[in-house]
Amino acid sequence: MRGLPIGRWACLKKASSEGMHSAAAEEGRVEDLARLALQRWGVVFREILSRESLLPTWRELHQALRRLEARGEIRGGRFVSGFLGEQFATTEAIAGIRAVRNSPESDETILIAAADPLNLSGIITPGSRVSAQSTTVIAYKAGVPLFSGDLGEVRSRLQKA
């Protein structure tokens, strides 16, 4: 028996069967999807949104994100190093980034499920890609992936280290 899906999920509205939206309704739909991406990721930019197959084009999302920024709902800037282009973030994400930046580096090892949307190993972070299998976890230390495997295997390797 397969386990339940892991991670954060949200239902998307289907497009109208008529296929015709007013410009304002379409802008509102794209803004809703931009907010959904911001809720999921905290910080969004072109490379990270390329993972999302059901989102509109980057051009449409970028325009929506600029509107949200102009209304003061989100902030634009450079939040994640190593990526070109504009980035947008929620105020909560910015506060979290500042808190991490201002705190001393931790020796704590963190485990996340490979099926979690946070699994960006080999996608936008260095190293090999870890497939999103429900039985696989990834060990991180100081934001760097150390190794991955079944939970028991990873815990065993951590105890030996």
Q: Regions from the language model: what does each represent?
A:
Residues 1-161:
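Long, charged, low-complexity, helical-prone intrinsically disordered regions
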